[in-house]
């Protein structure tokens, strides 16, 4: 008789976090709510791979560096208003909001300086190679018209990104067009928000797990966190004037649903098992804007509420014990060509 415990595949847990500006308060609060019951362990230590785009990329990097979700929630609460130019009083905020709307017609709406300062204070001089968990952070190179994905050294081919500053990766993935200026790397590469092509990084993470890491799709468990989903309708004869901001939502929704469909097919979700747990909340159109910091407390409460509701289902799947230690192929004090490929964690 076959011993199933010997032939069972080791299960791998993946965390994916969407982009969405200040709406990232929702998934951060959700994770902070779950973290309260992990006996002091940071929530990121329970995952084998973490992927995040834009604001989700900032959260992903912080978690992979060992920060607690509650620490990152403090970042949103305390620095969010400064990053998005609010907190100066109702009258001043109202005037500045109108000025920024005008500015957005010809250039980026917000100054990226406060965001950089907040990230430098949070991440310091840590590099991607300091991550305790495998990372996947998408950005976009508009000049080369190509994807640009920051990755930890979890495969012998990944010889460069682990030396990049974590702050650079965070600024690149969060450089949302019309909101923040392009982030220029030390090698003069201009990068913009990964949300332009992978705002929901779930499919990206699943493909990485199966191809680069060699993990079978049926061994994967994915916790996918959204930054709210809007309801809206589009008329058959809609033009630019009637669509407005719905155009962006249209493309983002299409990408997200496509990503979820691909991930479900690759993991055998629904037909063979429940592989993907998607956490999101549907709200009316324009009820929550990605740079409106007045909704931070509402988002925080919503995140904690969802955590309380979903914890009984998620705990046995994701939080029974921390993930195995990640051993990168290359380390920061060792040159790639001298490093042993035997350190590969696949």
Predicted regions and their residues:
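Conserved small-residue
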Residues: 20, 56, 119, 137, ...
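Active-site gating loop/helix substructures
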Residues: 130-211
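Patatin-like phospholipase
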Residues: 8-16, 22-119, 154, 159, ...
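Surface cap/lid and interfacial helix-loop subdomains adjacent to catalytic sites
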Residues: 103, 108-134, 221, 235-267
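Extended hydrophobic secondary-structure segments that form protein cores and membrane-embedded regions
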Residues: 14-17, 46-54, 135-140, 191, ...
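Hydrophobic, mid-to-C-terminal alpha-helical segments
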Residues: 186-188, 206-235
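Surface-exposed acidic, glycine-flexible loop patches that form ligand/cofactor-binding
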Residues: 1-8, 39-44, 120-135, 211-216, ...
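C-terminal helical/tail subdomains of lipid-metabolizing enzymes
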Residues: 2, 7-10, 106, 181, ...
């Amino acid at each position: 008789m076959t011993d199933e415990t010997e032939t069972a595949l080791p299960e791998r847990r993946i965390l994916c976090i969407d982009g969405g500006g200040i709406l990232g308060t929702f998934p951060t609060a959700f994770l902070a709510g779950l973290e309260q019951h992990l006996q002091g362990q940071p929530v990121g230590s329970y995952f084998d791979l973490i992927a995040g785009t834009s604001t989700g990329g900032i959260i992903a990097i912080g978690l992979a560096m060992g920060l607690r979700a509650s620490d990152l929630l403090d970042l949103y609460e305390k620095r969010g208003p400064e990053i998005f130019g609010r907190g100066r009083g109702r009258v001043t905020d109202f005037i500045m909001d109108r000025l920024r709307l005008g500015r957005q017609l010809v250039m980026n709406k917000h100054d990226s300086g406060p965001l950089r300062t907040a990230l430098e204070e949070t991440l310091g001089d840590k590099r991607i190679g300091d991550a305790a968990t495998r990372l996947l952070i998408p950005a976009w190179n508009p000049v080369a018209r190509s994807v640009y994905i920051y990755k930890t050294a979890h495969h012998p081919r990944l010889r460069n990104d682990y030396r990049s500053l974590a702050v650079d990766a965070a600024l690149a993935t969060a450089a949302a067009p019309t909101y923040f200026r392009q982030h220029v790397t030390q090698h003069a590469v201009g990068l913009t928000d990964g949300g332009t092509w992978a705002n929901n990084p779930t499919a990206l993470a699943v493909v990485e797990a199966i191809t680069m890491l060699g993990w079978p799709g049926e061994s994967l468990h994915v916790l996918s966190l959204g930054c709210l989903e809007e309801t809206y309708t589009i008329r058959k004869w809609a033009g630019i004037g009637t669509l407005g901001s719905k155009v962006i939502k249209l493309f983002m929704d299409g990408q997200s649903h496509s990503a979820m469909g691909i991930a479900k097919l690759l993991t055998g979700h629904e037909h063979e098992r429940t592989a993907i747990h998607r956490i999101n909340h549907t709200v009316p159109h324009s009820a929550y804007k990605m740079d409106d910091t007045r909704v931070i407390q509402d988002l925080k409460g919503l995140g904690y509420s969802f955590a309380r509701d979903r914890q009984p289902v998620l705990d046995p799947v994701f939080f029974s014990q921390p993930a195995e230690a990640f051993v990168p192929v290359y380390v920061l004090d060792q040159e790639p060509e001298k490093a042993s490929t035997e350190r590969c964690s696949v």
